[in-house]
Amino acid sequence: AAGKLSIGVTPWVALTFLPPAVQRFRQRMPEVQLEFFEGLLAVVQPRLRDGSLDFSIGRPPPASPVSEFHNTPLFSTHSAVVARRDHPKAGCRSLLELEDAEWVLNWDPASRESISDNLFRKRGMRVPHTIHLAHSLAVVLGLLAHTDMLSIFPWPLVEVTLAKENLWALPLRETVDETMVSI
């Protein structure tokens, strides 16, 4: 029986884990039509709510005692601070050296406080005033290539974009962030 499956995916999952997963799915269920929506929580949650998405793969919603969606953790991965190769801070070895940096993050606004807590406050750092949120990985890549902004990418995305996009993972001593991926 043919059917349709609508899936929301975060940009970095779309570039790393989605292609082989889709190939395996298509081998087992070739008659099912797939529809993909790229987006963070702000994009996928309304579609999950109205039923136009069957599920999403990405960062889980912030912890809440009353969650409207059931989510199952799939895996976690570490992240890295990235910049263009010739960035003035490309050689920095500590997050403290990045306290005055300008950031562009491909993260959902709902995650902003937990990001600030996990990345900056727990290390005794002040939260930078210039954390820009971008709802597009293409926007982040463009800004990283042509400005002095920094970003944080999960390692699987670092591995597929560094050479191609002329980016550099800063050799920091600290662990930057652990990203949980759930369905």
Residue ranges of predicted features:
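Hydrophobic residues within well-ordered alpha-helices
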Residues: 7, 47-49, 98, 142-148, ...
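Thr-Gly-centered strand-to-loop micro-motif
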Residues: 83-84, 106-107, 129-130, 153-154
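Secondary-structure junction motif
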Residues: 59, 89-93, 101-124
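Acidic, Gly/Pro-rich loop/turn segments at junctions of secondary structure
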Residues: 28, 39-101, 157, 174-177
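Conserved functional loop/turn residues at catalytic and ligand-binding sites
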Residues: 33, 47, 51-52, 73, ...
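Beta-alpha-beta core module
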Residues: 64-72, 77, 138-183
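Ligand-binding cleft/hinge of the Venus flytrap
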Residues: 21-28, 52, 113-127
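Central regulatory/effector-binding core of bacterial HTH transcription factors
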Residues: 2-63, 133
